[in-house]
């Protein structure tokens, strides 16, 4: 059987972009990619500007925003529901973990502080966030007292937090995990829990149950701080850290450049090799900003910046299209 393939395209960039950074976040709304947060120097937030990239003109600009503008932060996440972006948590310049939830209305360019009290997730950074058409999901991360393994949902219609059942002991608290919504279920993939992890867990909101799933095939090696998105019945992952630095977050660990796909129905992993027309592979990196997106009618993974094996922050922009026809997508 021929190997599965994927196509990398390096996107042209014009205008006033975010520059080199890691531990930041992006989200796609319509034909614009929004970027927020991150660091150029380890643990030092760059700024709190909201950068927007028009995919039709390949041009960056700084959004002219109003409202409750979030302070600078690293280890932040964001996800979009409709035309609204939600930003949660992170770590500020004083290395304080944060727990505010902000929304940004892309139709009015207005920030709103949605939640900052005790009714939502505890303060954290380097957690993971994803969304469906009604909820923003927050999982794990680095909390004040250690790594976390809780799953929260923010209902954007009811405007309230929902704390989901706590998973079993097998799902250890972790930072930098993959998180994806696939066919109504929430999947937690890998992450760092003192060591790099290689386990996969699934939460069914309808039954409020957690299951650790056993996968097979070309299983990726244990990793964290990788890029992960859900497309159809698949979870696509790219890159990440496979061996942490002795300097912790101040240094660069060993990164990988591999891409894999997990079929959530068969629970089989397959590696995605570079296909014809794939150019400018991003190479090994982690701590990137990423989002699922659709460009030129193709579903795939948007990837901006990140940290390199030399501990240099990156400022390039890629789109990865997995060629999933061979497995029924």
What is the predicted function of each stretch?
Residues 1-329:
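Kelch-like beta-propeller repeat domains
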């Amino acid at each position: 059987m021929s190997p599965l393939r994927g196509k990398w395209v390096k996107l042209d960039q014009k205008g006033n972009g975010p520059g080199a950074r890691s531990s930041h976040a992006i989200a796609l709304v319509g034909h614009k990619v929004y970027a927020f947060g991150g660091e150029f120097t380890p643990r030092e937030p760059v700024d709190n500007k909201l950068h927007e990239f028009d995919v039709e003109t390949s041009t960056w600009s700084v959004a002219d925003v109003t409202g409750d503008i979030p302070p600078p932060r690293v280890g932040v996440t964001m996800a979009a529901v409709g035309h609204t972006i939600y930003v949660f948590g992170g770590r500020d310049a004083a290395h304080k973990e944060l727990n505010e939830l902000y929304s940004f209305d892309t139709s009015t360019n207005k920030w709103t502080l949605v939640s900052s009290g005790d009714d939502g997730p505890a303060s954290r950074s380097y957690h993971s966030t994803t969304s469906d058409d009604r909820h923003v999901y927050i999982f794990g991360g680095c909390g004040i007292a250690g790594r976390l393994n809780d799953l929260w949902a923010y209902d954007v219609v009811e405007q309230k937090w929902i704390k989901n059942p706590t998973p079993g002991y097998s799902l250890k608290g972790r930072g930098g995990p993959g998180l994806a919504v696939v066919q109504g279920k929430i999947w937690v993939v890998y992450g760092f829990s003192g060591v790099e992890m290689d386990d996969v867990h699934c939460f069914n909101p309808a039954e409020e149950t957690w299951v650790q799933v056993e996968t097979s095939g070309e299983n990726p090696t244990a990793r964290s701080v990788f890029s992960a998105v859900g497309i159809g019945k698949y979870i696509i992952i790219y890159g990440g850290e496979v061996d942490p630095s002795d300097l912790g977050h101040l240094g660069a660990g060993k990164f990988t450049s591999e891409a894999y796909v997990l079929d959530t129905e068969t629970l089989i992993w397959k590696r995605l090799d570079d296909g014809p027309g794939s150019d400018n592979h991003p190479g090994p990196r982690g701590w990137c900003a990423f989002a699922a997106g659709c460009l030129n009618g193709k579903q795939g993974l948007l990837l901006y910046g990140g940290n390199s094996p030399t501990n240099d922050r990156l400022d390039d922009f890629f789109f990865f299209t997995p060629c999933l026809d061979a497995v029924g997508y």
